[in-house]
Amino acid sequence: MAKKVVTNIKLQVPAGQANPSPPIGPALGQHGVNIMEFCKAFNARTQGQEGMIIPVVITVYADRSFTFITKTPPAAVLLKKTAQIAKGSNEPNRTKVAKVTRAQVEEIAKLKMPDLNARDLDAAVLTIMGTARSMGIEVE
């Protein structure tokens, strides 16, 4: 028989840096989950991706056990890393803060493909280009 799901918790946690402090501790603690067990498992799973923000979906069951799924980093984080900028433009349509090539956008789209609802790579590239445009990053 399948376990009864109590809730799904969605968080964005820096890879390899999960610890019991907020926001992780309170989010898991209110559902009775062993926080340190999650932190150790998450840090082990995201070991090679230091410096990236990793979205995670934690499924909590009635017996206080849990499973979690890590997703790919947000497109905005990948674009900022590729363009080597700290943040996007305050006025995206007026001032451009960086340039990325279409090949770089295609690499990001390939990485993000499992989490995007795009049918093919071209649609995924257009999605990433839209994110870049809204951040003030020009695609060449």
Curated annotation (Swiss-Prot):
The record's Gene3D superfamilies line, in alphabetical order, gives: Ribosomal protein L11, C-terminal domain, Ribosomal protein L11/L12, N-terminal domain
Q: Which GO terms describe its biological process?
A: translation
State any GO CC term: cytosolic large ribosomal subunit
Q: How is it modified after translation?
A: One or more lysine residues are methylated.
Task: Briefly state the protein's biological role.
Answer: Forms part of the ribosomal stalk which helps the ribosome interact with GTP-bound translation factors.
Subunit:
Part of the ribosomal stalk of the 50S ribosomal subunit. Interacts with L10 and the large rRNA to form the base of the stalk. L10 forms an elongated spine to which L12 dimers bind in a sequential fashion forming a multimeric L10(L12)X complex.
- The name this protein carries in UniProt is Large ribosomal subunit protein uL11
